[in-house]
Structure formats: C-alpha cells, structure tokens
C-alpha cells in the first residue's frame, strides 16, 4: 500500500499537474496516518518522503499536525523535520491552542507557520514568536472575521490568505483566494493589503522569488480586474499569455497520464463489495410519532443513506 500511495503522489506531481495554465505546487504530507489510532491505507515515514524534496514543485513539509509529538521530540517526526530543513524548504504548522513553552518548543523545532488560529490572541502570540500566520477562510473553518486586526501594518507583511479545506462546489460558486480578498475588502480592508496577503506574502514565504508581484524580473502571471470592490476577474495571463477570459479557459490543456501508473493507482480497492443491505438497521420496537405507532422492523431511510455513505468511504479507504 505504501508503493501505491507513492505512485499516486508521483502521478499528481509528475503527470496530472504539469504544463497547465496554472502553477501547482506541493507540500509533502507530514502525518500519514494523522494519529497512531488511524487505520490509513499506508504509513509514510521520513525515508519515503525524502526523495521528493528534490523536486522543484515540492516546497516543503505540510501541516505538522502531531504538535505534541513534535514538542515531545518524537524521533520519527524530528527526522521528517530534519530532512525538510536540510533541503532548505518550508515546514507548515497545525497547532490549534498550542501556547507558552510548548509553542516555543514547536517553533524551535523548525515549524514556520500556522493556519489554525481562531482568535486574535492566539494569532498574536504566534506572530510574536516569529511564525507566519495563514488567515483561513474555507468551507469547514472561517476565521477571517476574528483575525481582521491582522490586515494592517505591522502584521500584514507576515500574514497570508488560505482556504485550508474548501469544497469544490464552494470553489466554483464563490472562488478561492479571490473570494477571501472580496470578503476582506467588503469588511473595510485596504484592497492593496488584501491583494498583497493573497499574492506576494505567500510567494515570499514559500520561496517563489519570481512570483507574486508585477515588477521587472517577476513572472508575468497576471489578472485583469473589472474593479477592486467586486474583484471580478476579467482576464488571466500565465507567463504573459492570455489563458482565460470571463471565467473560461481559452486553451484547455490535454491531460497526459502514464497509463501504467494510472492503473496502479486506480485499480487499488482490494475488498469485497459492500451492499446497502449489510448496513441497514432494523427497528426492534415501537415508538409513538405523530399520533400513531410505527411498524416494527421498518427500515429507516436515514440509515439507508448512511449505508450508502459508509459504503463509499469504506471503498475509498
């Protein structure tokens, strides 16, 4: 399963995201599984991650969720940190509510940012200790309103905009970083500051020295807006070439994927078929509802739906 996992990673990095009208970068997963209690499809240790640091579109180690393992000097976690540091790349944090001496130890280990701040006091403590703050506004968590004081000097030069988890439907309907910029401007933030936090600051943080600004020596990745209030993107330029206009790509890229690698990744669900009948629950008694007794042994529709969801996730695991 480790081999399949690595083949899947290679497919994402080498095949499906190259030569697009979009620059796609990666952070390596630091916690697979997320905790020792998880039953993941694979366990990725430092030795499996190490070769990927040499790839130019791999920028570092993703959110170090096992913050307490880091503070307690777990050898496996520290080895991942050492490998990333030796490669000269970034280590992202994930440490909600970590404070005081434990936060000091976490940052001293080499963790350089955090996206889990839900209030301004937590963000300020982490800023004062040298971390970058990723202001998160996604589907599952929305922290921007609580962190609005960061959208001004002297803090905004160390803060950037991120979504963390955002559902595809929300991306299509509302947008990505552009959505956060619009929301920030509507809340009274200086448009120049909001744009800088969505472009220049993250590029500086991740070491993308020639991206994030309109200036000599920078890659001509540009957008043309109708205005700064609605922040409607009219045109998108990639390396100086017009690639999208009024929300549509002009020349969609043909996806080329190594067929052998594709088969190894997608032909990987080794389990018996799960049927809805296996997951249906039967009532064993009666209960009063709307003035009448329900029938014993009736199938509950909510459990039928749950069964379908469970079957999907069981297959995905």
Predicted region positions:
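Single conserved hydrophobic/aromatic residue that forms the stacking wall/gate
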Residues: 1-8, 12
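N-terminal hydrophobic targeting/anchoring segments and the immediately downstream early-domain regions
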Residues: 10, 14-16, 310, 317
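Alpha-helix-loop-beta-strand connector modules within alpha/beta enzyme cores
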Residues: 15-26, 81-88
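Metal-cofactor-binding active-site regions of metalloenzymes
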Residues: 20-38
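Flexible loop/turn segments at secondary-structure boundaries
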Residues: 32-37, 68-71, 99-103, 123-124, ...
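Histidine/acidic residue-rich metal-binding segments in metalloenzymes
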Residues: 43-63, 69-134, 141-162, 172-187, ...
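Active-site microenvironment of metallo-dependent hydrolases
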Residues: 172-188, 192-317
């Amino acid at each position: 399963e480790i081999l399949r996992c690595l083949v899947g990673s290679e497919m994402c990095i080498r095949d499906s995201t190259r030569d697009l009208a979009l620059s796609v970068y990666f952070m390596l997963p630091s916690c697979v599984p997320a905790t020792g209690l998880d039953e993941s499809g694979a366990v990725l240790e430092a030795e499996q991650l190490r070769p990927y640091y040499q790839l130019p579109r791999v920028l570092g180690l993703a959110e170090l969720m096992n913050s307490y393992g880091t503070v307690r000097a777990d050898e496996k976690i520290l080895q991942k940190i050492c490998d990333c540091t030796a490669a000269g790349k970034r280590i992202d944090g994930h440490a909600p509510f970590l404070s005081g001496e434990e936060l000091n130890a976490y940052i001293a280990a080499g963790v350089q940012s955090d996206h889990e701040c839900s209030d301004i006091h937590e963000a300020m403590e982490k800023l004062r200790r040298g971390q970058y703050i990723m202001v998160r506004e996604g589907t599952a968590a929305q922290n921007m309103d609580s962190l609005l004081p960061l959208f001004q000097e002297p803090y905004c030069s160390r803060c950037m905009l991120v979504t963390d988890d955002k559902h595809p439907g929300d991306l299509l309907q509302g947008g990505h970083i552009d959505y956060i910029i619009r929301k920030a401007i509507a809340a009274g933030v200086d448009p120049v500051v909001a744009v800088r936090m969505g472009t220049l600051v993250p590029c500086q943080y991740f070491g993308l020295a020639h991206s994030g600004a309109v200036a000599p020596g920078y890659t001509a990745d540009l957008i043309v807006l109708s205005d700064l209030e609605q922040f409607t993107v009219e045109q998108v330029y990639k390396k100086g070439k017009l690639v999208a206009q009024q929300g549509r790509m002009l020349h969609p890229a043909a996806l080329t994927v190594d067929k052998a690698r594709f088969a190894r990744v997608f032909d990987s669900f080794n389990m018996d078929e799960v049927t809805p009948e296996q997951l249906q629950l039967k009532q064993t008694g009666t209960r009063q509802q709307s003035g009448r007794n329900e029938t014993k042994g009736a199938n509950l529709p909510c459990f039928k739906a749950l069964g379908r969801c469970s079957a999907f996730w069981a297959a995905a695991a």
